[in-house]
Amino acid sequence: MPKKNSPLLPKETTPTQSSVDTSGSSNLTWPVSEHTIRRPLWARLLGQILDPWLDLSIEPEHCVQYPEHCVQYNDGRPIIYVLEDYGLCNTLILDKACRKTKLPSPLIPLPGNPLQRKRAYLALSRRSSSNSLIPNQRGGKTHSDSLANLLQAHRIRDTLDVHLVPVSIFIGRTPDRQSGWFAVLFSENWALVGRFRRLLAVLLNGRNTIVCFAPPISVRQTLNEGLPPERTLRKLQRVLRAHFRRIRETVIGPDLSTRRLLVDNVLATEAVREAIASQAKRDGTDLSETWRKAQAYAWEIAADYSSPVIRSADFLFSHVWNRIYAGVLIHHVDSFKETAPGHEVVYVPSHRSHIDYLLLSYCLYQCGIVLPHIVAGINLNLPIVGTLLRKCGAFFIRRSIKGNMLYSIVLSEYVAQLVAGGYSLEYFIEGGRSRTGRLLQPKGGMIMMTLQAFLRQPRRPVLFQPIYIGYEKLIEGTSYLDELSGEPKKKESIWRLFWNIPKVLKQKYGQVVVNFGEPIALNDVLAELAPEWEGQALNENEKPAWLSNTVNHLARQIQTRINSAADVNPINLLALALLSTPKHAMGEADLIAQITLCKKILLELPYSNRVTVTPHTPERIIAHAEQINILTRVHHPLGDVLRVDGDNAVLLSYFRNNVLHLFTASAWVACCFKNNRRISRIALIRLGVGMYPFLQAELFLPWTEDQFAQHIQQVIELFVREGLLLSAGDEEEDPLTRNTSQTDEVFRLRAISHSLQQAFERYYITISILVKNGPGTLSASELESLCQLAAQRLSLLYASTAPEFFDKGLFRGFIQKLRELNLVWPDTYSKLLFDERLDTSAKDAQVILGRELRHTIERISPEATKPAPK
């Protein structure tokens, strides 16, 4: 920036008095030296009070390059300063800047008083009269009559030629971190703030104030364009506003606080206006009443982005994360930053905790990435909390919008405005937090809105960025246990939030890892699935035949990419090992050996190049789990036993499920030897490929069937090297065998198999109930309910299981896959039909499940209640 002695500064000359013709017959120049007419007493007194708090950096032209032939400030013509908005602090700062640069004072009126005010400055907008600490962005700006009076004075007096000098004032543009969060909160931004807030800004950040003088604008030249009076006024106001906006963008960055503008644009769209008219006609109400309802919806939804609040939140949460977490690790963000420029970015993270919202925003901010507009459930729109989340970029949507067409269209148009405006987005396609640790089946609503918005205005290419968030301990762990035990979900409450904050701050939650997955370019997806689309914009109501399929493909691809960027932390490895035993306990040596085997599988047979694995040794992993109170050590003369007690065992199933997909192939191979001592390679691979579509649908696996077969082959080779299996040869027909005795190798093989055991039990329950009831008896929903009941009963009779074992959603996914593969299909009454192929699948289960377990499942499989004969 130019310094005080910069050539851009006006020459240090003092205006001198010249003759004035009050009739307007002579050329008007600056009339009186400041030494002749003193500034008002109140200005001198307040200026002395404010001076110690101010340190001005003067920028006559700032960083915008203007032509060298611009009229200088001291050419003798009268000057009127133009501020962006009124305010006593602004007036005193301007006066000090003028004295510092030897320019005429804004507090001394011009001869003839063309402004009809006792001053030589005007403002485009009035500052809010509110004394609130919160910036007023909804209140409208009101322009003064001074500019209109000045133009009228020029029309009356032909020789009058006043120059307007726009002056931009920025208090606390970039306060240092050492200044504290309170100073950051009151730094300069785009909001029109009240008097009290401006005063606090001066007291806290006044020593970092920038005053930007722009080149003068000749009012006479503007009038000489010959436009009608109203158009001249509007044009001059528009030019000045554009100037102030350009300077503000240069100094403090672009305006992201566009809530009012977005709401106005949403309500002005053709789709919303038609929806308002349709709703009013349907309800028999007045158009204005329905319009107000649509406006209320828009304000309920819209974010209220505020840079000072975001900077304050960063300052606050830096301390919070350091207190409760042992670090936040971010992987693969550099490759994302190389790919993202020029794209409309949509962040699509996994959803495990309410902390996801805050944590990801914190990580992006720390990486120097502009925060996105984040979709949040309306349940989080709590007093105080909701306001803060809005100001950090959150916009709120209702959980269910079915049947509310007006709300649906307002929401859709709001998203379209964000996409068209180039704002990045963030939403969780699972719809809600996963209570089981698995990725939930995706919901395509937000993807559909994003895709439709892009197709309407395909300006910038869209990039979906999958993100995996991994925790070692959940803040919501206790509430998840209650919900999985059958208790209803507790409604979010501001009081419960405040009550829980001290408890949370006393706990240690281990380390958090944020992994950026491989991004998905929307244009590449459209080129594959919609080759007939050639980049042309579509109409609002146009829905091509390929749209729904594209949304579904995108949703599954996002979940698959999230899983392909998983992080394996110490708790994941402990969960895989300990939950494979009946009492969730192992000797220390056995636990170390099992963790070592799991790490070897991950490192020697990498799932993808974005999966990260903890570098800690098994011994360090065990010590870490003891530190955060997950493991209990029981001392014994024959060797210590490490176990998980009570609720921790159920919570560990959550962390096992986080990484279940990484061990799919190895768990499949191990499962085949749980109840069989010998099996050929070709049979093992054939059965695995037959089971793969169901595993892929449930776990979002990335391979094709051929790739999965190759992965199984690699697992077999690793198990042979580790001594877990014995091979009679390398041919497909050659048998693979395991030891008959209860060796350490057999123990480790059984432990690996346990992670997929419950999935196969669910599959067999579904097939058993279908076969027992016969074709044409059960609908899909009836089958789901019976499967859930059978799984609950099996859990009570046979062995304790994790709560997700009888999750209806998992059964629903399996039944849906059966339908996709045409193994079952509905009749005209929506009852499921099947043929002998289902019996073949049941026979294949004999390879995986033991005889006793199969018999128990067949015995408890319920039959549908048949209606009593008439």
Curated annotation (Swiss-Prot):
It catalyses: sn-glycerol 3-phosphate + an acyl-CoA = a 1-acyl-sn-glycero-3-phosphate + CoA. Residues 1-27 are annotated as: Disordered. Its main location: membrane. Pfam families: Acyltransferase (PF01553), GPAT_C (PF19277). It is a peripheral membrane protein. Pathway: Phospholipid metabolism; CDP-diacylglycerol biosynthesis; CDP-diacylglycerol from sn-glycerol 3-phosphate: step 1/3. The keyword Acyltransferase applies. SUPFAM superfamilies: Glycerol-3-phosphate (1)-acyltransferase. Residues 13-27 have a biased composition (Polar residues). This is Glycerol-3-phosphate acyltransferase. InterPro entries: GPAT/DHAPAT (IPR022284), GPAT/DHAPAT_C (IPR045520), GPAT/DHAPAT_LPLAT (IPR041728), GPAT_PlsB (IPR028354), Plipid/glycerol_acylTrfase (IPR002123). It is found in: Cell inner membrane. The gene is plsB. A motif (HXXXXD motif) lies at residues 351-356. One of its GO terms (cellular component) is plasma membrane. Its EC number is 2.3.1.15. One of its GO terms (molecular function) is glycerol-3-phosphate O-acyltransferase activity. It comes from the Bacteria.
